[in-house]
Amino acid sequence: MMYPMPSWVYDSVVYQIFPDRFFIGKGKTVEDKKDLYLKRGGVIEKWGVPPRKLPGAQHVKIFYGGDLWGIAEKVDYFEELGINVLYLTPIFLSDTNHKYDTIDYFRVDPQFGGKRAFLHLLRVLHERSMKLILDGVFNHVGSQHPWFKKAKKNDPEYVNRFFLYKDRHRSWFDVGSLPELNVEVEEVKEYILKVVEHYLKLGIDGWRLDCGHDLGPTVNLWINMKVKEFSAEKYLVSEIWTYPAGWDMVDGLMNYNFRNLVLSYVNGETDSIGFHLERAYRETKNIFGCWNMLDSHDTPRLATMVPDRDLRKLAVVLQFTYPGVPLVYYGTEIGLTGGEDPECRATMEWNREKWDVDLFEFYKKMIRLRRTDPGLRFGEFVLLNDSPLAFLRKAPHPLQNTIVVVNPGEEKVLVLSIPDGKIMNTTPLVDVFSGERFHVDGGVVKLPLLARSFRILKPEDLRVGKYRLYKRV
């Protein structure tokens, strides 16, 4: 890695929020705020009405009214769930609900409450020892950005900041409203770094780079240099939809490779992903800083991809036990469903009677385990078995180790050899969910597995009278 990862990242569980769809603050409704949207060409919709795809992508102009005030009001919920880092999709001035088409990076959108709401949210989170990560969209801007409007008029100061041709311009995925910036131009580089530094000075804890693959390794590096120049404890994660190795100029990336492997495994499309997980662990220098996510604002929701709750729990177990930072997309913890964008961006459900309470409690337990267990926070990854998948998270002390088994198949007995000479003979391995005990015999343990089940096992010191098994290791 180019830079050491901030120390707090090892203990992090990230919660991703799409601000327009989370909660409306100050007791208001979207109707109360309608002028903020209508005067900028938006359309308002009642909370709870499912989002739908419209011709010409007109669904990006539909607003439900969520804001930063509302997010701040839900800090008790974040504590109840156990997360300690918020990642917000873009909050800067823009005329769409997703705000990936920035008009002004230095202005928090009034639709979200403006700068006052942003600073209030930041203060509330820091008072509860929570972190805030913002989304930096620097590969492109919106077509209403002042620079682009001037460039379209052939202003010589701005023309070279974009890629303009005779009858068109280069834009992200050829979406005309998202003109790409020429990030190699010095004025563009200085502008991006000013934005990065501005919000670091205001107190945010890090950045997520949108379209990190489009920006390329060099731009990712010089943004991280600016971040680490400000503070070694500020974090930079990049959106890279590839195999995770080779991007160690940042602290981590959004690990879509992990997501796709896990979903294929629990859905029965393959019976073996251990080789791939082990190779990625071995080859990815910043694996502990990567975000292990199962869904996001860019994918169908987990409950839609994996409708069976037992199989879904297996995916969540892997998310919280593989090296890296678990990322929970808002509402996934209560069972929200939704297909491709915009269906995956539905409003948060706040009526607990409509929640999948069993799933919510399961998430709470997994989050608590991930944040308190040394093996899961920083242990090495040692593959024990490929089908069903079993691995060891090996910590400095053997009693801190964690063994994970995930079986999406039929009932069976798994015989595991544990490659740690300090796991002593007769050591009890305790299932942290069921409380069952299984004893190690000569470095081997036999584990009965139900169909579509998992085990998370912790070694326990054996005491017999005054005798202690782990007195010298």
From Swiss-Prot:
Gene3D superfamilies: Glycosidases, Golgi alpha-mannosidase II, Oligo-1,6-glucosidase, Domain 2
GO molecular function, one term: cyclomaltodextrinase activity
EC assignment: 3.2.1.54
Activity under varying temperature: Optimum temperature is 85 degrees Celsius with beta-cyclodextrin as substrate. Retains 80% of its activity at 90 degrees Celsius. The half-lives of the enzyme examined at 80, 85, and 90 degrees Celsius are 147, 108, and 23 minutes, respectively.
Keyword Phosphoprotein: no
SUPFAM superfamilies found in the cross-reference section: (Trans)glycosidases, Glycosyl hydrolase domain
Keywords in alphabetical order: Carbohydrate metabolism, Glycosidase, Hydrolase
Keyword Hydrolase annotated: yes
SMART domains: Aamy (SM00642)
Activity control: Mn(2+), Co(2+), Zn(2+), Fe(2+), Mg(2+), and Ca(2+) inhibit the hydrolysis activity of the enzyme whereas EGTA and EDTA do not affect the activity.
Residues flagged as site, Transition state stabilizer: D298
Enzyme type, top EC level: hydrolase
pH sensitivity of activity: Optimum pH is 6.5 with beta-cyclodextrin as substrate.
Entry's transmembrane regions: none
Membership in a protein family: Belongs to the glycosyl hydrolase 13 family.
Designated name of the protein: Cyclomaltodextrinase
